[in-house]
Amino acid sequence: TILSQQESVVNAIRPHLLPLQSPVDLDSLIDHIGTSKIVMLGEASHGTHEYYTWRAMISQRLIREKGFSFIAVEGDWPDCYRLNRYVKNYSGAGDSAYEVLHSFNRWPTWMWANWEVVAFAEWLYDHNKSIPVNKKTGFYGLDVYSLWESMESIIKYLRRVDPAALEIAERAFYCFEPYQGEEGTGYAYASLLVPEPCTQEVVNLLAEMQRNAPKYNTDQ
């Protein structure tokens, strides 16, 4: 039965459980992470207080004790970059994390615009205060739902700082243009039928921006 299967799973997991009652209970996890450069933190449900709170505590220790330099979340890049500007103490970035997160407007807004993220962002803001600009810990979004907003932000930026790379960015944008208005799902379906339709354009853009990264000395 389903109940017996669930009990079997619970019984298999129980010997490996580690109680989480205080921050020191994370010690074994932090030790186990060792010298890893990437740590992926998930959740069983979006928006659950306990997951967000413990994930924030883990992130804080990774930043303080392991030297981690950025947080990447399942969020829209343009929106999350506004929060990134705030936690890095950039001029004109907003007066509070609450104010910045209030601008998140894509459903589900509560996924990141919640009090747990506000608290973590304010901690990150304080943590970054005494750190050199190039060493501050950032906060970035990498979800594909903001495909069009992200591409428009890239084009707007390159139009001002790197006209040569702008042409490459526009080629990538035009490749995706037939699928605009479909939140990327149209492109996903098309990629099943047409091998690598826009891959090379995106790779070319990424390579060009990485090559020129040292001269991109502005965050706008």
Regions inferred by a protein language model and the residue ranges of each:
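Structured catalytic-domain cores with a bias toward divalent-metal coordination
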Residues: 1-220
